Amino acid sequence: MNCKTLYYDTYGRSPDAIAFCPYRISPLGAHIDHQYGKINGFAIDKGIHIAYSAKHNGVVELQSLNFPKRAQFHIHSIPEEKVGDWADHCRGAAKMLAEKYPLRVGLSAVIEGTLPVGGLSSSASVIIAFLSALANVNGIQLGDWETIMMAKAAENKYVGVNCGKLDQSCEVLSKRDQLLYLDCRDDSYELIPRNPAMKPFRIAILFSGLERSLANSKYNLRQDECKAAAYSLMAYAGMDYASSSTPG
């Protein structure tokens, strides 16, 4: 694991722990989650690893194997607005955690993504893995849905991406050889096991050669377009969109 090696090279010792969050694949659900629809997906064995150790002075030190430049902030003075670099996802995660729990301990961390950036929810994976690490050094235990909604809030409120909960839910709730089926209106879900009668199959993940960040893409425009389409369709059907929507 390269993040462990870089951590040792940087700090002269091994990290205290490794946090991991998988990437996800969603056969159905893109732009459905933020419109309170039903989605499905599953996690894969690739994802984000974070090698980390506690820092009792409250400082968070970050470096990444996928991005240049290091980042640093204090858990008691997290910038109110995003800085505009790769570490905003970690700042947002720390800010959401600090709004609910008292934080005393920071950490030193090396972050490693095992696939090219973008396309398989790497931003959500970074946030969830970092939330796990920061919560751990502060003795905080987060439940599954608490993690999902906190990670979603970090993207919505801090990074500025108006995503739904598809990515976070797939990464937190998925189990091996099962498909997650989630209703984004009421958060009810089930894990559907693979039917023994199914023929063997494989799923291929192809890299287009392009890397992207949702924060720098037209994702929010797509979200607005989906909402406008929903308003139009429901108005045509004589349905009240406002009464059919719930916060998510």
Predicted region positions:
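C-terminal nucleotide
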Residues: M1-L28, H49-D85, Q178-G248
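A generic beta-sheet turn/junction motif
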Residues: A43-K46, K175
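Short, charge-rich binding segments
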Residues: G41-A43, A51-A54, K100-Y101
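Gly/Ser-rich oxyanion-binding loop with an adjacent helix/lid
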Residues: M1-I18, I25-K38, H76-S77, K82-P196
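Short Gly/aromatic-enriched secondary-structure transition segments
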Residues: Y36-A43, R222-Q223
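A general secondary-structure signal for short beta-strands and their flanking turns/coil
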Residues: D45, R104, F201-I203
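Conserved strand-loop elements at the edges of beta-sheets that form or border functional pockets
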Residues: F20-C21, F42-I44
